[in-house]
Amino acid sequence: MKNLKSLLSFLFASFWVAIPLIALYACACAIATFIENDYGTSASKAIVYNTPWFNFLHAYLLVVLIGTFINSKALERKRYASLFFHSSLIFIILGAAITRFFGVEGLMHVRENSAQSSFESADTYLNITLNDEKKLSLKTSLTFYYSKRLKPIHATLDHKPLILEPLEIYKQNAIKKDDATILVLKATYNGVSRKFNLIKNNRNEGVEESEMFKDDKLSLSFGSAYIELPFQIKLKRFELERYAGSMSPSSYASEVEVLKLDNTLIKPYRIFMNHVLDYEGYRFFQSSYDMDEKGTILSVNKDPGKIPTYLGYAMLILGALWLLLDKKGRFLKLSRFLKSQQIASFLLALILISPFTSSFANEGQIDMHGGKSAKIERQKIENPANKEDSKSAILERLKRLREYSKDHLKAFQRLQVQDFDGRIKPLDTIGIEYIHKILRKDDFQGLNAMQVLLGIMFFPNDWRSVKMIYTSNKALRKLIGTPLDESRIAFRDAFDSRGYKLKNLVEEVNQKSPNARNELDKDALKVDERINLVYTLFSAQFLRIFPSDKTTAWLSPIEAINSPNKEISSVATEFLKNIFSGFDDALKTNQWDKVEKTLKDLSVYQQEHAKNLYLSSSKVDSEIFLNHTNFFNSLTLPYIFLGLLLFIVVISSLVKNTIPNIWLTKILYMAILLCAIAHSVGLILRWYVSGHSPWSNAYESMLYIAWASVIAGFVLRSKLALSASSFLAGIALFVAHLGFMDPQIGPLVPVLKSYWLNIHVSIITASYGFLGLCFVLGILSLVLFILRKQGRFNLDKTILSISAINEMSMILGLFMLTAGNFLGGVWANESWGRYWGWDPKETWALISICVYALILHLRFLGSQNWPFILASSSVLGFYSVLMTYFGVNYYLSGLHSYAAGDPLPIPTFLYFLVAIPFALVILAYFKRHLSLPKLV
């Protein structure tokens, strides 16, 4: 009996089982993401996510979690904070189970002035109809096309047995993201057997096939089933807004009515992005639309597991805060240990405040809602540059533009423009924003951004043939018809005699849900946006420089010319005549007086009519200063160099068992402090210029991570911590300037206008900073382990201090990563109707949570070498974060292009990034024997 009790305790209440289970769970999720990448979503669900063994793994984890609580006597030991925090996982798992087994989701297609009382399920069914009357839907997991063990399905129809024997199931084509499937099966009914070839398309819609079984007609389809609703949704009107001068959609909405089944009106409603219809437990989200714009596609969701799941999320966040403040908790025990080591730790106060004061989100995009007319009536203005010219004349103009305009850009740079979000900014900023987005860099052929902008505006015909629009996908370049080895295309390349070459592709991509888009789709949308931006520059729709007395909206030239206000129309016409003729003359004679006078007159007009919107001279100067000083990028090398130098100084003193050179350490300390002050000034300057806290996009989030890292190093008052944080700050700034993040100052409202999204991204991004610090501290610890010798007790003391800092940083990073990930689920559920969809990005975030949870619980296995284990695992565990942040985009979603393509080459430095830490772990292993004292 005692042995049985011990066995049960081991199997259901032991960390020796719980930790391997977490590792197994993380590995299963990781494998599933690669299966999805190679074979599609249906394959990953059939092999992992929707399987009984994966469901069992969740249940086993839940039982072991409860059993471990009971076995550890957490309640008797008054570990209330830990009990409350971990209990949240019970509610989250139970809520997910309720959603998984009892929730329904699908799509509803409604045409204008018609109503629907059913929707198509997201799950796959075998739909059976007997004699066009009796219907039966059998839920099936026949979705993986390599399955060889297909089991027969038995059912009863009209009191007669029906046997369905799947013979074969395979994909219709080789495209990864295309789940179009053919199911071959044999149906036996009424003593007769017939063979069916059932086709399911990429939208999970089945094509019905019929056969006669003696006197009975049996119809089968493989795909969605229709789920009936107790009410109707009627579409009154579908609205689609497009970007000015293009066919690309910017937003869409459905005006609907909720009706009873007898057509009695219940209520009208407007459904659009992030504005959901809730009725009788069902939620309706705007998903897509018909090509003729006369119908809408709504995502439908009914989730009975929402309440326990949300309760679990709330408990998790509150429990995390409680654990950080609990005197009996690990975090404050580590803090007290650090104080005993004469290291002041105010890290907790810094981090608990900093992430919640930020609200940065995804990269901002330019929202082009300008004039409705795309045709600027330049024929009214004699512009010599508008005429077609020879190639030599064009090259000569470009040469003069490069040479003559360089010293006369200031007046253009300071000209104030209102962007499409209503923000007033200097034209210099507009130029950098637009040109950076079009080119993916800030200069081109010896021209800076402002010169490129002026060239496009004043000589549009010259620039229609210039290959400047960046593309990243060879398949897209093949579609457009440009050389595959040239990453840039010309505006003219995107058009032929039939019109815009990307029109159909962009329309198709916008029909897809975001998680169904492949790399070709994503690049098509980006290139489409760049082409729209170039067109906006050609047509001067962006040049909103004429203030209106009646509204706060400024007018573009065409809007001003066509304005009923004769004063504005006259000013705009005169300005355009003078500026075009003056600019053309300036490039011929290098005389800029007329241009500068015209711009000065316009500035005076703006100041008189814009009132409070007109920017002060200091704010304009500050913004232009930020645009051209490359402020934050200049701090990258100093941060890295000073951090490494301080590390070498400290390590050298430890090896020699001497005190570090006081003057040298003070100089390095002051140098890093000056960098931090400059960093802070830069952030404050961005704050002043933008009018809001500078955490509005991904670029600024990296600036924030770098700043928080270096400040944390100062607060900890440890030379090693400061060297690590300085190095990490430099790396963060390096990543921010790699070229895939737009550095422009954007509006506070993100592209996806959601408060939850702000919180989600801010907390998760901040967590990466702390887990990155764990990586650096782990490397430091391993190096110190390698340098250990008898008699170097100060080395051991330093390792223990770093270990405590490392564990505290990891606790904070894990809490923030977990809270941020689940809050992202809240945003997704409130915006799209699904808080978890096993998307590779969110799955790898979950894997990272599992990895760091596993690391922090390894100490419960009773090892005596916790500092070494923590150092090694904090280094190796960081690869899960790198996979989440970079790997998912480049080696899962972006591994192949649409239908074909070469794998993305693995950079050489990546091999060293993996090999060096592993080598350090192996070398440190031989000197691993060091225990952390008991914490009180």
Give residue ranges: language-model regions.
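Membrane-interfacial, low-structure loops and terminal tails that flank and connect transmembrane helices
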Residues: 1-9, 334-347, 658-663, 788-805, ...
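Hydrophobic alpha-helical segments
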Residues: 1-49
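Membrane-interface segments at loop-to-transmembrane junctions
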Residues: 11-12, 45-49, 77-85, 337-344, ...
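Hydrophobic cores of alpha-helical transmembrane segments in multi-pass integral membrane proteins
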Residues: 15-34, 52-67, 84-98, 285, ...
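Short, hydrophobic transmembrane alpha-helix segments
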Residues: 39-48, 73-74, 651-660
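Internal alpha-helical transmembrane segments
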Residues: 46-125, 297-346, 358-361
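Soluble non-transmembrane domains of integral membrane proteins
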Residues: 107-304, 359-625
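Bacterial N-terminal signal peptides
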Residues: 347-355
